[in-house]
């Protein structure tokens, strides 16, 4: 055989040709490899290397979306990758021992590596591209209710359904916030348990009605009758109660709610078994299933005498958990175990915590699954077109729960979301805009566009006020179509004035610094990422891990959750995150470092930061050689040191300057090159516009032009740019039309 990697690439291409449900949704696939597999090192680095290739293509001008040519060209993009980690490896890691990679056929040792080195490779790859995730094999199988049927070897693509091969389950989730009374600040336990009971029965019926892709999966699903009941909106519930997601109390409440979820489901399952009998494979798994049920119950009581469990558990804190929730959890598990011992269970598994991405939108959830909120600010797409900016729906109830007055709450929310109106705005308002030459119709158009504007500048452009207004203001087409044109600055507003007006109208998008808000309440509003341009707070990655650990002892399967990390997170942070997860009894975990993929669905910041792709040694060599060009400085001297104590002058162009525009076609693509010159004819700025090449290439060319212009104004000779960039090649390329000296 050519090895597992070649066949994984075949499977990846096959998945790329399949659309989920026959529509435009991408295929969902999980690929898992045991940590002692001979090809494990290649597997770990597979997607990281492919991500590097995709970035190179994107940098060359290909679109960065997942359906674009860049990602379609590389392999490994149609699956989530995970490695299976047994307890033996964790012990080798702790003792800085060796780890053997063994043949699949006869078990012979193919290679011996340091456990620490392999662990670092996993973290490095996850840092670069968010894959692989980690599944803890020993923990998974210690909670296995049906080991007579074999080991649990794999999971579904999101990693919450962990059970025997050739089985399946249907998912259903409840919106926790719908059971919470904001006014009286009470969680309706009776209704919650009633809903859990109904949905357990519904999912059991769905086993009979479901269709399966193969005879083997149909048979396995009938034999074990696994269910996938779960919940969503935990993050919103805690915020509405005025409780921080990353807090001991928050984890105690999450543990109790999850204990009720699974306890009530198994209690109902046992009742059904008393009428129609347990699942067909129950008798051969009875002892193990009752052992697992007993461990679930012990976690509700924090009794710490678990059977067959080799790791610590984050059980419900008996002192912190509210009495009604604690009693509700314990009552559910008392009933589940008592009835199960009498009648068995209709279902081998009952619950998972799924990501609830799509159904969460339909259920009016601010947060999905067990996640905290991603950010406080949302942009809601309107049915009639356009967008409406709304704050997290939980901010108001949370402030009410924390004791803030209605006036204080309104001002805090306005601080976050803004007034979305010119009325009362400092500096930029109806009166000042009229004085600058805008008429009532112009101002009304701007006012109507503000609710969907991310920043105030987005409401001041030719698409909002129209070309006639630009002409009336004597602004040329060349100016207002330029990518860096700012109408407010053109009208004479300073950056400080624009910034203050922006915060008033569009809000800060963070609650940090809000009027009246006490410092001790800030943690209640912490999100997975920094909020807004000025936000600094976010939930530490261990806050995510501990929340998973609080819920895991009460889940039949596992938890699909992303541990969000900031762009600045290190490889060591990821190593620590994965290692701590192993010790807390989490079954499976995945991380995502902001910006680690060139294409991502949500972004918290537009700051580029330094490129993590650069080789430090190569960067150092380039920097040192560049310094030698500046003068007689020793190799290794930095520009900061060379210019210490001096000010590097920038030679600004006059506000009215001459230049020229060159229209050309490169391989049929129209390009405009515009320049600005000093009075002596020296080049001082360039602008590049290219049609029909997408926002990415246009943006890159625009940024390139700005970089060159800044360099020229700081005294970098034009020849240096010419020598550096001559003979570079990338698309679009070909014959040039429009200039007699360039072909």
List where the protein language model places each region.
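Function-dense linear segments that define catalytic or interfacial modules
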Residues: 1-7, 18-21, 125-241, 363-414, ...
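Active-site cavity-forming subdomains of large catalytic enzyme subunits
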Residues: 1-197, 202-222, 226, 243, ...
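Extended, hydrophobic alpha-helical segments in both membrane/secreted and soluble proteins
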Residues: 10, 14, 40, 214, ...
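Glycine-rich phosphate/pyrophosphate-binding loops
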Residues: 26-31, 240-250, 560, 585-598, ...
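Catalytic alpha/beta core of large soluble enzyme barrels
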Residues: 160, 203, 207-208, 274, ...
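Hydrophobic/aromatic-rich, well-ordered segments within soluble, folded domains that form packed cores
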Residues: 226-244, 573-586
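Short, Gly/Pro- and small/polar-rich lid/capping loops
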Residues: 327-342, 603-672
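Short, surface-exposed loop/turn segments at secondary-structure boundaries that line and modulate
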Residues: 698, 724-742
């Amino acid at each position: 055989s050519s090895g597992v990697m070649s066949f994984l690439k075949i499977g990846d291409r096959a998945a790329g040709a399949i659309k989920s449900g026959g529509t435009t949704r991408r295929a969902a696939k999980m690929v898992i490899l045991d940590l002692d597999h001979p090809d494990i090192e290649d597997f770990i680095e597979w997607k990281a290397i492919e991500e590097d290739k995709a970035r190179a293509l994107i940098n060359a001008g290909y679109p960065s979306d997942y359906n674009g040519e860049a990602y379609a060209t590389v392999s490994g993009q149609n699956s989530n990758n995970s490695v299976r980690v047994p307890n033996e490896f964790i012990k080798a890691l702790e003792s800085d021992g060796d780890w053997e990679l063994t043949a699949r056929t006869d078990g012979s040792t193919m290679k011996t590596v340091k456990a620490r080195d392999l662990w670092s490779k996993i973290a490095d790859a996850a840092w670069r591209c968010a894959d692989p995730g980690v599944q803890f094999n020993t923990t998974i199988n210690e909670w296995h209710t049906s080991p007579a049927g074999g080991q649990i070897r794999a999971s579904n693509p999101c990693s919450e359904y962990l059970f025997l091969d050739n089985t399946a389950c249907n998912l259903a989730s409840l919106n926790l916030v719908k059971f919470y009374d904001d006014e009286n600040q009470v969680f309706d336990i009776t209704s919650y348990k009633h809903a859990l009971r109904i949905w357990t029965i519904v999912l059991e019926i769905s086993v009979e009605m479901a269709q399966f892709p193969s005879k083997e999966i149909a048979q396995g699903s009938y034999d074990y009758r696994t269910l996938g009941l779960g919940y969503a909106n935990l993050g919103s519930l805690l915020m509405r109660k005025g409780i921080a997601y990353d807090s001991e109390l928050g984890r105690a409440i999450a543990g109790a709610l999850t204990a009720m979820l699974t306890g009530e489901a198994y209690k109902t399952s046992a009742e059904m078994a008393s009428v129609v009998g347990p699942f067909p494979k129950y008798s051969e798994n009875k002892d193990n299933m009752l052992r697992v049920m007993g461990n679930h119950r012990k976690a509700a009581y924090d009794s710490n005498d678990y059977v067959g469990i080799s790791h610590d558990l984050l059980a419900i804190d008996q002192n912190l958990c509210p009495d009604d929730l604690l009693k509700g959890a314990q009552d559910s598990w008392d009933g589940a175990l008592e009835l199960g011992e009498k009648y068995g269970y209709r279902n081998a598994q009952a619950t998972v915590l799924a990501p609830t991405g799509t159904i969460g939108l339909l259920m009016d959830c601010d947060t999905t699954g067990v996640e905290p909120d991603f950010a406080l600010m949302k942009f809601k797409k309107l049915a009639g077109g356009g967008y409406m900016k709304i704050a997290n729906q939980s901010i108001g109830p949370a402030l009410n729960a924390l004791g803030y007055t209605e006036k204080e709450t309104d001002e805090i929310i306005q601080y976050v979301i803004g007034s979305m109106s010119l009325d009362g705005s400092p500096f930029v308002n109806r009166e000042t805009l009229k004085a600058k030459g805008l008429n009532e119709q112009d101002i009304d158009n701007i006012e109507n566009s503000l609710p969907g504007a991310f920043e105030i500048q987005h409401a001041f452009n030719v698409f909002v006020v129209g070309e006639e207004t630009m002409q009336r203001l004597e602004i040329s087409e060349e100016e207002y179509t330029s990518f860096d044109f700012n109408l407010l600055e053109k009208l004479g507003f300073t950056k400080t004035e624009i910034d203050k007006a922006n915060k008033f109208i569009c809000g800060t998008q963070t609650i940090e610094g809000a009027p009246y808000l006490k410092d001790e309440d800030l943690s209640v509003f912490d999100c997975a990422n920094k909020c807004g341009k000025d936000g600094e707070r976010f939930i530490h990655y261990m806050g995510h891990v501990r929340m998973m650990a609080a819920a895991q002892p009460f889940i039949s399967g596992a938890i699909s959750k992303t541990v969000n990390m900031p762009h600045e997170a290190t490889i060591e942070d990821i190593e620590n995150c994965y290692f701590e997860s192993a010790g807390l009894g989490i079954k499976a975990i995945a991380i995502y470092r902001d910006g680690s993929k060139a294409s991502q669905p949500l972004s918290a910041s537009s700051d580029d930061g330094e490129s993590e792709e650069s080789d430090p040694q190569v960067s150092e060599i380039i920097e040192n050689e560049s310094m030698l060009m500046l003068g007689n400085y020793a190799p290794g001297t930095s520009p900061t040191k060379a210019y210490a104590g001096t000010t590097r002058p920038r030679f600004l162009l006059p506000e009215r300057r001459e230049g020229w525009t060159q229209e050309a076609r490169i391989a049929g693509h129209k390009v405009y090159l515009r320049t600005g010159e000093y009075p002596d004819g020296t080049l001082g700025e360039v602008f590049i516009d290219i049609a029909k090449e997408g926002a990415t290439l246009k943006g890159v060319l625009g940024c390139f032009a700005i970089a060159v212009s800044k360099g020229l104004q700081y005294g970098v000779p034009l020849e240096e740019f010419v020598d550096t960039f001559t003979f570079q090649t990338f698309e679009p390329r070909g014959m040039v039309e429009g200039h007699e000296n360039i072909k």
